[in-house]
UniProtKB/Swiss-Prot annotation:
The keyword Ribonucleoprotein applies. It comes from Chlorobium chlorochromatii (strain CaD3). GO terms for cellular component: ribonucleoprotein complex; ribosome. The gene is rplI. HAMAP family: Ribosomal_bL9 (MF_00503). SUPFAM superfamilies: L9 N-domain-like, Ribosomal protein L9 C-domain. Binds to the 23S rRNA. This is Large ribosomal subunit protein bL9. GO terms for molecular function: rRNA binding; structural constituent of ribosome.
Length: 151
């Protein structure tokens, strides 16, 4: 029996795949558990239109991510942290601090999408990578300054 998988199944395939399985397996397990549906002409057409819509949606998200990347590259971010007289920070600058600085500039980016090469424990200029989409990553330049010493 031909079925369309609605969920990923390790032994059969990924969601959206059309696979052939034994009738008993489909009727007694896959279909009742909502893991798969019967592959009829109507469901195959619906699957195809859904894939096209999904592809358009992904392309729009990718385009939006590229536009955001261009804007973020132009930014001159400043991150403020408490520091001692010698310029050494009390603590470290984290991806959450960078996400907060980006939010202040109008970019809502999750801290888990920001990667910092090494811990930042001093004042100065640094760079972090921001992954906006699966294939869109942008380098963010930022400067760590001591709190209360705005220029």
């Amino acid at each position: 029996m031909k079925v369309i998988l609605r969920k990923d199944v390790a032994t059969l395939g990924d969601a959206g795949d059309v696979v052939i399985v034994k009738n008993g397996y489909a009727n007694n397990y896959l279909i009742p558990q909502s893991i798969a549906i019967r592959a009829t002409e109507g469901t195959l057409k619906a699957l195809e239109t859904e894939r096209k819509q999904q592809a358009r949606k992904v392309e729009m998200q990718r385009k939006h991510a590229r536009e955001q990347a261009q804007k973020i590259e132009q930014l001159a971010l400043k991150v403020f942290a408490r520091a001692g007289e010698s310029g050494k920070l009390f603590g470290t600058v984290t991806s959450a601090d960078i996400a907060e600085a980006l939010k202040a500039q109008g970019f809502e980016i999750d801290r888990r999408k920001i990667t910092i090469e090494a811990p930042i424990k001093a004042l100065g200029k640094f760079e972090a990578a921001v992954k906006l989409f699966s294939d869109v990553t942008v380098a963010v330049q930022f400067e760590v300054e001591a709190e209360g010493m705005e220029a």
